[in-house]
Amino acid sequence: MYKLKKKVIYFLEGTGLLLIFIFLRILPLNTSSFLMGKLSSLIGPKLGVTKKAYNNIKNVMPEKNEKETLKIIKNMWENLGRVIGEYPHLKKLVPGKNNKIQICGIKNLLLVKKTKTPAIFFSAHFANWEILPMVSIKNGVPVLTIFRKPNNPIINFLIKYLRSDLPMAPKGREGAKKIIYSLRNGISIGLVIDQKMNDGIEVPFFNKPAMTSNALALLCHKIKSLVIPVEVERIKNTNFKVTFHNPVKVSKNGKKKTSLQIMTEVNLIIEKWIRKNPGQWLWLHRRW
């Protein structure tokens, strides 16, 4: 009975999302993004899950007053809605098309080709985090993106279809071999690493202990690779800026840094991005 109920729920959820995406795909990119952003900013702040975002902001940014906190929450929901509205139009966000994406630090991206060394690109749930692999591939740097496989098989199929042009590997054991194989064969990978990982290590984040995945550090210990931070910012509406920052130094005096040292530096970089544009980060994670 439980399995049947779960299948029915999955079917209703998946079919509902599919119909929404079909409708959004009919609309122009700008309209789809605006519509979902507006709806999300009106409905999202009233949902119970918003309490988690509110508590997170108060926990790590106590200097923000009530008005500023509520503005961050509203902006967060608008950005999340826009991401949903942009999902059916991902291929229209390819760099060079409609001049939607401004790229900075291109020399750091091209280091992969220059040094013939694969990169571990890391980013966060910022602006539209789906843009990174398209920017990289467009500039001749193949990248394998790591994703969390949805429990709902219909939603999983839909997401894989929308990302059909992008090489992907699921998180966990299933994708681990593919990730290592890719790096060893010169193919870069893309990680979104701002979520809590109970099987990770405790690393400071906003000066507070946070369980953090150390997969990035373990990979660069195992396989020679560049570790490149990629910051994605929503400049206005569906216009973005993607910045490839200087590689993180994973060695000191010829000796590899520890996982804790590397991940502390990574968390500091992400924290800097969040403080710069707090309304563009997804505060809904149970990060601390």
What are these regions (language model features)?
Residues 1-123, 161:
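Membrane-anchoring hydrophobic helices of lipid-metabolizing enzymes
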Residues 95-101, 148, 165-171, 205-207, ...:
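Short, flexible loop segments at the rims of nucleotide/cofactor-binding pockets, characterized by
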Residues 109-110, 133-134, 156-160, 179-180, ...:
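Short amphipathic alpha-helical segments and helix-helix/interface helices
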Residues 19, 31, 53-56, 154, ...:
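Hydrophobic alpha-helical segments typical of transmembrane helices
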